[in-house]
Amino acid sequence: MAKIVIIGAGAMGTAFALPCLDNNHDINIVGTHLENDFIEELKNSNNLHPGLNTQIPQEIKIFKFEKFEELLKSNVDLIVLGISSKGIEWVSDQLSKLYKSTKIPKLLMLTKGLSVYNNQYELLVDKLERLLAEREIKKVDISAVGGPCLAT
């Protein structure tokens, strides 16, 4: 059983958690700094996720941002990035603060899209790798999901 932390409590990150649970992994979802109110509403609605119209099983633990550092420092096997494309810089800052002196766990990026860097298109997974390297986090094992995406 792998210990997986998903960053982002939106539809994509939460939808990804369900098959992970089906495969007997230990799943923790931690919201970003922008999702505390959303997570509170989720807990008040008996874990009914409004974006998925699905009841999230109690075995999937959902935390507010205040638990971010604690969860990511707890022998994680895989960090899943279920954040928007606008959050790539933010998450690279957060990860580089936490893993400055230790090896970063494997990353799986659910975020898809392109950005522009030096007047050329750049895949978001390449952007993340570049931003982490600029912050002294090198030799990162990053995988990315491809294809169309609707988390419903």
Each language-model region and where it sits:
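Flexible domain-boundary/linker segments
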Residues: 59-60, 96
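Rossmann-like NAD(P)(H) cofactor-binding subdomain of soluble oxidoreductases
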Residues: 74, 78-152
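NAD(P)+-binding Rossmann beta1-loop-alpha1 motif at the extreme N-terminus of oxidoreductases
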Residues: 1-54, 60-65, 70, 117
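Short, well-ordered coil/turn elements that cap or connect secondary structure elements
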Residues: 22-24, 56-57, 102, 137-139
